[in-house]
Amino acid sequence: MLRWMTAGESHGPALLATIEGVPSGLHVTTEDLRRGLARRRLGYGRGARQKFEADEVSILAGVRHGVTTGAPVAIRIGNSEWPKWETVMSADPVDPSAFLIDAGTGDEREIARNRPLTRPRPGHADLPGMLSYDVPEARPILERASARETAARVALGVLAEALLEQVAGVRLVSHVVSVGAERATTSSTPTPADEAALCEASMRTLDPEDNARFEAAVDAAKQAGDTIGGVAEVIAYDVPIGLGTHVTARERLDARLAAALMSIQSVKGVEIGDGFAQSALLGSAAHDEIVRGADGHLTRTSNHAGGIEGGTSNGAPIIARAAFKPISTVPHALRSVDLATGEEAVGLHQRSDTCQVVPGAVIAEAEVALVLADALSDHAGGRSVGEMRRNLEAYLAVVGERA
């Protein structure tokens, strides 16, 4: 079983990520993490923060000479902007007079940074967080609720994808299928071999015409002083049959995937396979018939289920989609109430992206990888990569005799 968690604030000194249960013998390097984090920074419609803030990643524990040791893996992602925030975000008490000193910018930005944020933003964690945690302003809430935290999850996803590929040959790919009302028109489904092309495309799609329409939708939203959402799709190839279970609700693979994807900031909907569209079909057309393939093994005539039946992987590619609402930090500020004065106001505004669906696809891929790696560990667990491979091979040999 894998267990992971993250810590850190958006403008704190660093994000931390730890994961327990990673077997020994997994090949992973700091450069792998850098490449993974670089993918998260791509995309049309990103905000100014991506231009000046760097992900300073380092592995603190659990890896030696590029190979995991079996101990918990700890990762640190430093915040290159920390010097500008070390007074405002100090863990220790700060003399109020310190806030009257500039942050080396030659102006009073430090004062603005520390101004109480008492006008909660609609769509954010601000208001429920302030009330639930009994704090007078939104800074302690928004710092942790920020999507900046997903950088740590993407780093963990790099480890998960390495585990899936090195043990079971499972590989993942993600892409954007819609932006606002614009939907992809191409019927081609990307494979992991298309990763370089997807990274080169500003909207993470293989079709140039789709890419241009998606860009235009983002441009229109930005010009209107607004934000725009979209849908990202993740596909996992060569997933062995039998991951997950029908036995308990919390261990159903589709339930775990849905929970993981819904945990991403801005995600408001998840579907597996044909998802909501499947509800419009008759039963005779909605399910994937089982036939004997040319090689004598069982196969399917379609993949409406998205690779999961009864909470268990069925051997077909796993397909999951996440719907991202438009970012809540809207330049055209929405109405709110100042909790310090009780007066009507507009929600506070900080720099933000116009569209987050491209990095959202990369984050969704990381979440799917973590769930699948955990399910693989449950099914073929071992203390080393070699032991996991042997366990999986023995299981698949038995399955191959029957199906």
Per-region residue spans from a language model:
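Generic N-terminal targeting/processing segments that precede catalytic cores or assembly contacts
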Residues: 1-403
